[in-house]
């Protein structure tokens, strides 16, 4: 991993490649089988603080992806700050949004969908990230999406209604949903409040290989939302207040679960950080 201050070095903190975007996205999958091994699961779990271990154990379903998301949160912040993973201290706002108590403290946002976890981390200002699943939408009744009047504006529902039922509508829904939830995380409220106020308007489907940036004024605040396909079944959206340049790409690294665990071990040589 490349080290150095992400505020002054125009290189990805994870791979060292030059970049135009100041943040990075890491993702991992709990479906690769690594955490299916009980011994490996327990070894990975012990890398978390006791409170986080207890939170994972309380889960009746989806424990592996919850563990993956907590470890990825640690790894993303450790790589970005240069702090040793074991020295990072996290807390939660009243609304449940996690933040880093250690200093330096970048902005970050974590999302998980199906068996995949992602983190977006960068310097300066609030951020929101969301990963939305197409398969989850396909499991619903054909017209169930069109009944979500408390989620979508009239313009958004009209666009969803015009999409062909099935895969096409599910993909457009995933795009809209990822935008709304990324915006909610950016605000620190998640899905609380009137989601219709996060009106994205009439959108075309997100194309494969496309990086699309929207500029919106939502609830009196100017925001930029960037979206791309993470894989064939998930849309990734990021929300922030900054204005991206036309050439900026999302620096996305898909990290195998075994590598996430290895990099979160105490032996990882990074600098110390300060905790409030």
From Swiss-Prot:
Checking SUPFAM superfamilies in the record gives: 4'-phosphopantetheinyl transferase
Q: Does the keyword Transferase apply?
A: yes
Q: Name one GO cellular component term.
A: cytosol
GO function term, MF aspect, one: magnesium ion binding
Gene Ontology biological-process annotations = lysine biosynthetic process via aminoadipic acid
Record-listed E.C. numbers: 2.7.8.7
Annotated keywords: Transferase
Q: Which domain of life is it from?
A: Eukaryota
Cross-referenced InterPro entries, in alphabetical order? 4-PPantetheinyl_Trfase_dom, 4-PPantetheinyl_Trfase_dom_sf, P-Pant_transferase_sf
* Pfam families cross-referenced by the UniProt entry: ACPS
Quote the function comment for this protein: Catalyzes the transfer of a 4'-phosphopantetheine moiety from coenzyme A to a serine residue of acceptor proteins, such as alpha-aminoadipate reductase. Necessary for alpha-aminoadipate reductase activity.
| Family named by the database record | Belongs to the P-Pant transferase superfamily. AcpS family.
Record protein name field = L-aminoadipate-semialdehyde dehydrogenase-phosphopantetheinyl transferase
Source organism per entry reads: Eremothecium gossypii (strain ATCC 10895 / CBS 109.51 / FGSC 9923 / NRRL Y-1056) (Yeast)
